[in-house]
Structures are given as C-alpha cells and as structure tokens.
Amino acid sequence: MTTVSTNDFDQQHLWHPYASLPPTYPNIVIDRADGIYIVTEDGTRLIDGMSSWWASVHGYNHPKLNAAMIKQLGKMAHVMFGGLTHQPAINLGKKLLSIVPAGLDAIFYADSGSIAVEVALKMALQYQIAAKRPTKQQFASTHSGYYGDTWHAMSVCDPINGMHSLYGKQLPMQHFVAAPPMGFERDLTQSEREALTEFFVKNSDQLAGFIIEPIIQGAGGMRFYSPQYFQLLRQLCDEHNVVLIADEIATGFGRSGKLFACEHAAISPDIMTIGKALTGGYMTFAATLCTRTIADIISQSDYPSLMHGPTFMGNPLACAVACASIDLILSYDIEARTANMQSVMEQQLAPAVSLNGVAEVRCLGAVAVIELQEAVNMPVFQSLLIENGIWVRPFGKLVYIMPPYVITDDELTTLCQALLKVVSSYLTRKD
C-alpha cells in the first residue's frame, strides 16, 4: 500500500472542512503543485481531478496568473474599498459586464462564495423593502441545493443535507420545493409545471427571492436538470415579483459547457453570484451582480446603502488575477473544450455502469459523476486513490471529477481510467 506524509500537529490542532478534530483519518501533506498535479511532501504526484474544489481551472502555478499577481504585488497588495477605488477593480468590473448574461449591470465584490450568497439574499430583501413590498421577507429554493456554509446561505441549502436540524430554531426558516427532475435533456411534465406554478401562487406574497444553481446542482447531489425548469422559474418569478437569484459559483466560467449555465436556458437572472474559477483558484474572491433596476431601487430608497462591507472587498491582488483568469478562459473556446472533455469522460467512464454497486454514470460539460448505491468509505477509498496516482474527493454516494480545463486528452484518459480502476477495486474489495 502506498503511504504518504501526514502531520501530527495538523491532526491535533487544525480543523479541516466537514471534519472532526482530530479527523477520523489523516490529511495528506501537499508540498507543491504544478499543472494538473499536486505533489505530496514525500514526492507522490497526483492528478487533481477536483480542480481544488472546482476553482483551479487553469491548473497550478500558471505563468500568466503568477505574472499578474507579481505585477500587482509590486504596486499594492491591498487598499480599503471604502471611499477608495483602484484600476484592477475597475478593469475587472468592465470585463465581467462584457461577458455575463444581459441585464446584469452592478457588481458587489465579496470575499467568498458563501459571502456572495449572503449579499445576494440581503440585496433581494433590501430591494423588496425599497419597492414597498413589505410582506416579501423570505426565500425559496429547491431540495438538493447547496449555497455555502454561512448562516443565511445555510438556510436556503437542502434542509437535510444542510443539517438544519443541528441548529434548532435559530436558523431562518425558508421555503423549499422538490428538487428539479433529473435529466438535462428531459422535458418537464405538465404535473411538474403545475406543481411549481402552484407553489408560487400559494407563497409568492412572502417571497423576496428564489435562489437556485442553474442546470447543475453541485454539492447537494451533482444533479443535472433541464433548462426548461429554469425557464419556467424565470417566468414565474417575473409574474410574481420574486427576485431570481442564480448561483453560478460552481457552474460559472465554463464548467457546465457554457460560459455561464444560465445560457443553457437563454435567460438572465436578476441577481447572480460567481466565484471559484473567477481567480483560477489563486485567491478567495467572489462577486454578486444585479440588474440596474435592483441597484437603482435600493439606491433611491429611504435606506440607499447596501449594508455590507467586507474588510478585503475588492482586493487588488484578487482583481488582477481574476482579470488574467478570465482572459485565459476566453482564450480556450470554452464550449468546444468542455464538449471535448465531456466526450472523453463519457467514453472512458461508461464501463462503470456495469459494475455491481454503481447506480448511474452521468456527464455534462466538464463534470462527470459516478453515483454509487451506498456511501463511500472514505479512508479505504482515499488509500486507493493515492495508490493509483489521482486525487478525487467523493461525498456520500457520489464519486465525481471536475478536472482543470488545461488537462490534455491523454491526461484526462489517464485520470478516468485510474478512477474506474479505483471504483472497481473499491466495490470488489473484501474488508
């Protein structure tokens, strides 16, 4: 069995995501990363199939991203955004407004995806208050959604997956509808349309906004659904004065096969959140964008200030590397690149369907999922991953990859074949 470096101090003192302290199994010490590889302290090279939780889309140690940060570092690493501005923030804003769905016209820079969602919810609520709709105080979402781990972001996550019961009555109560029916190419049935319509008829007087991950539900289940659902949601939000919030933090910048997943449905949201790939994984950074109508109604109200102001808002380093990251993404012909990635992953992972213990294999854009019938035993599975030279981070029954866009066909084939071997070995093991 392959062994890799761990660290006693880390295990005793450093809390990791969704883990106990000490963890139930040790964290692997990473020394460096380059291209599509992360390298452990003892020199083991692993193909990163996760893009570091979907952010490092250009791989690691990219010369253009490095250069952008070094150049900006020579000018200033940070300056407060209250009362001041700077060219990197302006440049990034112009670049974003030239590529996001039509109608989005105002930008709030945030620290992280979760904070971008908090700002989106706050923005929608403040807009409804300013628009003299005082009963619209709550939010709606679907089951199997995930929007982050800060307080109000958690409140709109799936109530079961989001562990709402753990926090008792302190977590704000929101409205939930059934998860969108699975199947990207599937038509909505009449009964499904009627159910969503009826929900709006019954509850819209209370709803400030409806938040959803367009087309791909990420950490709530890696589910792909029809653009028809998103189109119906846009229609119902319009009819009932409900703000449509599209969370593109995971899907934005090409992951779904379009630059933004909203494009699959040919619609624009009222508010959109972006993050992860925004800086190519170099810095924690995100943004919340809204229409000019929302910005104007808030800004011309009795309470004209949007009440949020992170210390590191509009960080110049983050803005500079985000500009470079977007330039790279636009240079890729992202639709062609992700379509090719989807084709390779579909072909290479198809044999997994025949494995006893696999429920489904599905791919869309640069996302591939092997759904098992039972939850993964992480210590066992992680050991097999390391033995086979790849890094993947399953959750529950879901074994999935979101590789960097810079991966070659040969490298992607190697990743998929290794993952297939891991899944096969895992399912046929004898404990």
Each predicted region: which residue ranges?
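Conserved N-terminal phosphate-binding loop of PLP-dependent enzymes in the Aspartate aminotransferase
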Residues: T2-D431
